[in-house]
């Protein structure tokens, strides 16, 4: 008599599993997200054998002293894109598992195809496609004018078969496009389900560690822009990056959200052209492409992205509201942060906007999360309210507290130096960030309170 297939109940939100169904997940506290998954033992490969092969640890494990472990830096190889290397922490580490996500049409497959075509001339690579046919990939490579003579292609969705072929080919870098269409034979659920995504990602990660193959997995995203699939998917990989960009903009930003071999929140900027993605070596010049006409409601701030400063322009529009509840719209900034700053401006700046619609936008599609943009945002709103432009050679940064104090931000000297390189001659910064020796030809105003910043603005 055949044994009944094993059953498990898995949460679709976080990937936690349970022996029986329950209404609420105990891990993420979400309701009605637990579904049944049937598991059947593989008829040809025992579990211990499978774990000790492609997905398991090679050889016999042994205990080692931490002091005996070599401290030599892991060797890296370049992707051929300096911006991509920057986001990865300096290049690709052999044996690492990388997950790249992004909206449909952002350019994930294009970026990886360009990368592998460049690297195929120097080392052995393998591009595994599960969503497109080989003819479709070849047509895109031909349209972009990429060298394809040395690139190895494979159209397959079975993880076991892919690892068998990779064992024979022994590539240095392998791309899986995408992880949501891959499946394992001993998991009786459809590709893209929580169980399939979790097990296939873990299988590939262990294969990368034991064989020294760098694997890049393409992942889908949800409606809110986060990576689809269980959270355990992001836990088991070494590096998670997200390729983002508006549909009406040709610029794409690549940002690292997790990196075991480098800095997180590192930013790389690309431009989508007819020849594919091209890296932008000086992003500040693009985000600051302003016209000669001076307009109110515009200010320039210096944000810190990963390991480098970036100059971006923030725009604000304050107009009389025709509705009982004025609108507050923030694009590229946190909505709650805008509400806090409006309250601080009313309480400590004496300017109330309760009857005004307020719209703010970060130019270029950049998403700013750090609080160093507070002071620039406030001055942009005041500029729009008074219809008085800020000087074009003025740069602003600083955090604003609830008591109206201007708090210092990290790397103040580097931010000021970056602004001076781009021709800015005046700066309003926190008093604690004023350098002992400002850049030549630059006038730096240090402020401690919001009232001080408004006073400097009046005197400009």
Curated annotation (Swiss-Prot):
SMART domains: AAA
HAMAP family xref list: RadA_bact
Pfam families for this protein: AAA_25, ChlI, Zn_ribbon_LapB
Annotated ATP binding sites: 102-109
Family: Belongs to the RecA family. RadA subfamily.
Job description of the protein: DNA-dependent ATPase involved in processing of recombination intermediates, plays a role in repairing DNA breaks. Stimulates the branch migration of RecA-mediated strand transfer reactions, allowing the 3' invading strand to extend heteroduplex DNA faster. Binds ssDNA in the presence of ADP but not other nucleotides, has ATPase activity that is stimulated by ssDNA and various branched DNA structures, but inhibited by SSB. Does not have RecA's homology-searching function.
Lineage, uppermost ranks: Bacteria, Pseudomonadati, Pseudomonadota, Gammaproteobacteria, Enterobacterales
The entry's keywords: ATP-binding, DNA damage, DNA repair, DNA-binding, Hydrolase, Metal-binding, Nucleotide-binding, Stress response, Zinc, Zinc-finger
Motif RadA KNRFG motif: where in chain: 258-262
Gene Ontology MF, one: zinc ion binding
UniProt-annotated stretches for the region Lon-protease-like: 357-460
An annotated GO BP: recombinational repair
InterPro entries associated with the record: AAA+_ATPase, DNA_repair_RadA, P-loop_NTPase, RecA_ATP-bd, Ribosomal_Su5_D2-typ_SF, Ribsml_uS5_D2-typ_fold_subgr, Rubredoxin_2
Domain notes: Has a putative N-terminal zinc-finger, a middle region with homology to RecA with ATPase motifs including the RadA KNRFG motif, while the C-terminus is homologous to Lon protease.
EC number: 3.6.4.-
C4-type zinc finger span: 11-28
Keyword Translocase: no
Official protein name in the record: DNA repair protein RadA
Superkingdom of the organism of origin: Bacteria
């Amino acid at each position: 008599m055949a044994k009944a297939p094993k059953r498990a109940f898995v949460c679709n939100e976080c990937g936690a599993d349970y022996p029986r169904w329950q209404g609420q997940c105990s891990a993420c506290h979400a309701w009605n997200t637990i579904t049944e998954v049937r598991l059947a033992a593989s008829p040809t490969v025992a579990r211990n054998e499978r774990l000790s092969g492609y997905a398991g640890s090679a050889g016999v494990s042994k205990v080692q002293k931490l002091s005996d472990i070599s401290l030599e830096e892991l060797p890296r190889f370049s992707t051929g894109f300096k911006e991509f290397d920057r986001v990865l922490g300096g290049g690709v580490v052999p044996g690492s598992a990388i997950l790249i996500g992004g909206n449909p049409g952002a350019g994930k497959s294009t970026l990886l195809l360009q990368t592998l075509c460049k690297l195929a001339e120097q080392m052995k690579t393998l591009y595994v496609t599960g969503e497109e046919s080989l003819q479709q990939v070849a047509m895109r490579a031909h349209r972009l004018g990429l060298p394809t003579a040395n690139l190895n292609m494979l159209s397959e969705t079975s993880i076991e078969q892919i690892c068998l072929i990779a064992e024979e080919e022994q590539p240095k870098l392998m791309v899986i496009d995408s992880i949501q269409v891959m499946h394992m034979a001993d998991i009786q659920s459809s590709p893209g389900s929580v169980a399939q995504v979790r097990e296939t990602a873990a299988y590939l990660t262990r294969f990368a560690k034991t064989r020294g193959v760098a694997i890049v997995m393409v992942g889908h995203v949800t409606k809110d822009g986060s990576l689809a699939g269980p959270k355990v998917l992001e836990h088991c990989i070494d590096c998670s990056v997200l390729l983002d960009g508006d549909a009406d903009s040709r610029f794409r930003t690549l940002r690292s959200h997790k990196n075991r071999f480098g800095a997180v929140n590192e930013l790389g900027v690309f431009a989508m052209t007819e020849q594919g993605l091209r890296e932008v070596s000086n992003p500040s010049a693009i985000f600051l492409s302003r016209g000669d006409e001076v307009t109110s409601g515009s200010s320039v701030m210096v944000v810190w992205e990963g390991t480098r400063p970036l100059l971006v322009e923030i725009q604000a529009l304050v107009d009389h509201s025709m509705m009982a509840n004025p609108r507050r719209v923030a694009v590229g900034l946190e909505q709650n942060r805008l509400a806090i700053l409006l309250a601080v401006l009313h309480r400590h700046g004496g300017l109330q906007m309760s009857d005004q619609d307020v719209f703010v936008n970060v130019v270029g599609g950049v998403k700013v999360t750090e609080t160093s943009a507070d002071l620039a945002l406030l001055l942009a709103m005041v500029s729009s309210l008074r219809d008085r432009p800020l000087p074009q050679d003025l740069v602003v940064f600083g955090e604003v507290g609830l008591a109206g104090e201007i708090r210092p931000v990290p790397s103040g000297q580097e931010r000021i130096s970056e602004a001076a390189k781009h021709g800015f001659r005046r700066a309003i910064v926190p008093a604690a960030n004023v350098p002992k020796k400002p850049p030549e030809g630059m006038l730096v105003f240090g402020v401690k309170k919001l009232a001080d910043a408004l006073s400097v603005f009046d005197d400009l």
